[in-house]
């Protein structure tokens, strides 16, 4: 089954490397897999200031973060393909990639997959949930040709 994806990409910052809409769509489709027939999703790529503001407002943490996931929650009787929004901070992703000795492309792919899994309801608060989510992330990232994102962490 092929996913019918409506992806809105908003580039609200500049950087030496930002993934293309085609790359982002591939990573989203890989993460969503057969979970949905149709999906609508917005990915907003932001600077540290906007990330810090959103992270403070929605998570109570006064610092920028790599990815924020905002799932769309419709009433149960209404079926819509709206998955939600991802907000990804380019500078945090770049710094983490450098610190973890990963390519930018590999870390961007990981952040998109990670964020999409949150939108699908996965979480990593409890150890058991974290193991399940990390295992799935690893499978998906490796299917894209990248190495295990949690190796050596």
From Swiss-Prot:
Cofactor note: Binds 1 zinc ion.
Its EC number(s): 3.1.-.-
Cofactor: Zn(2+)
Main location: cytoplasm
Biological-process GO terms, alphabetical: rRNA processing
Subcellular location field: Cytoplasm
Keyword rRNA processing: yes
GO-annotated molecular function: metalloendopeptidase activity; RNA endonuclease activity; zinc ion binding
Keywords: Cytoplasm, Endonuclease, Hydrolase, Metal-binding, Nuclease, Ribosome biogenesis, rRNA processing, Zinc
HAMAP family xrefs: Endoribonucl_YbeY
Family: Belongs to the endoribonuclease YbeY family.
Protein name: Endoribonuclease YbeY
Species of origin: Shewanella oneidensis (strain ATCC 700550 / JCM 31522 / CIP 106686 / LMG 19005 / NCIMB 14063 / MR-1)
């Amino acid at each position: 089954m092929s996913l019918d994806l409506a992806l809105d990409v908003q580039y609200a910052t500049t950087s030496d490397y930002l993934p293309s809409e085609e790359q982002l769509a591939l990573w989203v489709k890989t993460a969503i897999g057969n979970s949905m027939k149709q999906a609508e999703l917005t990915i907003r790529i932001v600077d540290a200031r906007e990330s810090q503001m959103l992270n403070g407002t929605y998570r109570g943490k006064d610092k920028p973060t790599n990815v924020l996931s905002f799932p769309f929650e419709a009433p149960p009787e209404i079926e819509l393909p709206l998955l939600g929004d991802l907000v990804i901070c380019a500078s945090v992703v770049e710094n983490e990639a450098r610190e973890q000795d990963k390519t930018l492309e590999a870390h961007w792919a990981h952040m998109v997959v990670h964020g999409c899994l949150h939108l699908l309801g996965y979480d990593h608060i409890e150890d058991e949930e974290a193991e399940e989510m990390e295992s799935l992330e690893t499978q998906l990232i490796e299917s894209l040709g990248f190495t295990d994102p949690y190796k050596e962490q």
